[in-house]
Amino acid sequence: MESFSALAPDPLYPEKESERHANKLEAWGTAVLRWLSRKRRQPLWRTRRILKQVHAEAALLAGLDLAGVRARADEVAFELRCDGITQASAARAFALVRQAGKLALGKAHFDVQLLGGWAMLQGMVAEMNTGEGKTLTATLPAATAALAGLPVHVITTNDYLVERDAQIMSPLYEALGLTVRWVSMDMEPAQRRLAYQADIVYCSNKTLVFDYLRDLIVLDDDKDEDRLRLERLRGGSGRLSELFLRGLCFAIVDEADSVLVDEARTPLIISGSQKEDGGAVTGQALALAQAMQAGHYRVQPAARRVVLTEAGRAYLREACAAWPAPWSIPFRREELILSALTVLHLYKRDEQYIVRDGKVMVVDEFTGRVMPDRSWGQGVHQMIEHKEGLELSDPRVTLKSISYQRFFKHYLRLAGMTGTAAEIRGELGRVYNLPVVRIPTHRPSRRLHAPDSVYRTMAEKWSAVRERCRELHGRGVPVLIGTRSVAASEELARVLADAALPVVLLNAKQDADEASLIARAGEVGSIMIATNMAGRGTDIPLSAAARQAGGLHVILTERHESARIDRQLEGRSGRQGDPGHTEAILSLEDAVLDSVKNSLWAGPMNTLLAAQGPGWRGLAAHWLRHAQARTERKLARERRAMVSADEELENSLSFSGQGD
């Protein structure tokens, strides 16, 4: 394999320089070289060769206790730092990490985990089924790189998983003499700076990127090494003391498809407050938007946008003819009204946001979790506050922004792991130069999938879910029900409570005791309703009686924007050879069908489904999957457009002498 020796962090803030292309031909040439480099990386059958080496090294370590592991770690670290990471030295490191896991955690890595770790150490995405122990797998490349002297970031989707994984794995790292800490968004800046000094840092993607943007603000886009070294020699409170990160050396991205693809549709923006008395304008915009009629605009739910018609523009010109600025400025007037219409029609309470303690809090659509320090721009956040009758916060002004695509390409080495990467293999390779390797399961899956059930209305769907839960609860089967929004989870909870069924709710508003709730979700007869919070990284342990009753039964109540998210929820069941069942109970009123309302097939399909002839439910299930696939294609186009815009911006900045 390519040695890591060239990646040693000699610079004060090591990271990969951005690729800048003078023209499309140069960009095409770079893409071809990337493709060839991915093809040169080892396929799985060749990757298996390391297993023999690891087992041979492990036999030599079998008698070591924790003190012996610690002493051997110093020897391995010296070799790695002198010679770089080669296949032979990596095998020795893996065997040592495996022995540390056995002694400190009571867990020795399986062969499939060794394969996954080796793939990631080479800069690949390891596709491992849910329940195969990705958290333990990540310790192999993380510890090996850290022993080699590289700062390591283990990145996952939320603070709950960050803290959980770091705490569980810390005894293993400490046995090797490595420091490990985690970073969460609610930590004070001084705490985060200290945490980033550790050998291995667990953090969420959002917290990490925002801290990187804060570093860019401190550096003011000036990363001149000589100047930074001079500042360090002078001592005192220079820029280096204000930085959070130690550069971008090696990242292991858990749930890589979610972080690198699903969440990569919009740039991350760090902003500052801007004192402005905009309450009057905000109220006027909402009042004017409410007065507009349907013919003045078109709502496009699938694209999450509103467009003005010519009739709408004419209405605004006439309504605002005598109004002062900003209403007298056409582009600003339309911008305000489009924001107001978007707030009225596309931002719904308990879906996109919740209200807590008199404040609007954004709900992450991918994780289902509250993001208390985040806000929407372009006046949208203030309009939502006005709509909810709350005190208006100060508008925000952009200080720095970056896309996930551009950020992660700055790492000297990038790797990832997920249970659902096959569908986006091409995108991961094209955008991040990340090959995907499929890792086999440790035990055969025993999960059973029932055919989809489709009902005409939402009410009929909830009724069917209620009856299914009643039947499963009577048999002692634990049930996990997935919903797409807080509102849907609360509505279903009321339906089940009215039927005297015991229900536990886990969503952005009910997240105080998440760990204990999840720990009880695998008990006999339990019923948990959850948003995406229980969809990724969540291990629901089964009691012996629940396993005997048939294992966890997962019910999907809506198709998500991506089939991968559905598969993640299904993956909570049947883990590590446990029994389990999954099924989808859906309706023709589900939000996913918004994407096909205006398609050529919408009319004929609606007619066929309304007739409810023989086989209509199977046809409806196919129509729902088609709508989901259509949404996936639309989102992929949006991401491609964003990458293109990013590249154009990068190239234009290179000619103007700017850029990160």
From Swiss-Prot:
Pfam families: P-loop_SecA, SecA_DEAD, SecA_PP_bind. Part of the Sec protein translocase complex. Interacts with the SecYEG preprotein conducting channel. Has a central role in coupling the hydrolysis of ATP to the transfer of proteins into and across the cell membrane, serving both as a receptor for the preprotein-SecB complex and as an ATP-driven molecular motor driving the stepwise translocation of polypeptide chains across the membrane. Belongs to the SecA family. PROSITE patterns: SECA (PS01312), SECA_MOTOR_DEAD (PS51196). This is Protein translocase subunit SecA 2. One of its GO terms (molecular function) is ATP binding. It comes from the Bacteria. It is an enzyme of class 7 (translocase). GO terms for biological process: intracellular protein transmembrane transport; protein import; protein targeting; protein transport by the Sec complex. Signal peptide: none annotated. It catalyses: ATP + H2O + cellular proteinSide 1 = ADP + phosphate + cellular proteinSide 2. Keywords: ATP-binding, Cell inner membrane, Cell membrane, Cytoplasm, Membrane, Nucleotide-binding, Protein transport, Translocase, Translocation, Transport. GO terms for cellular component: cell envelope Sec protein transport complex; cytosol; plasma membrane. Monomer and homodimer. Part of the essential Sec protein translocation apparatus which comprises SecA, SecYEG and auxiliary proteins SecDF-YajC and YidC. The keyword Cytoplasm applies. SUPFAM superfamilies: P-loop containing nucleoside triphosphate hydrolases (SSF52540), Pre-protein crosslinking domain of SecA (SSF81767). Its EC number is 7.4.2.8. It is a peripheral membrane protein. The keyword DNA damage does not apply. It is found in: Cell inner membrane; Cytoplasm. The gene is secA2. ATP binds at residues 113, 131-135, 539. It comes from Bordetella avium (strain 197N).
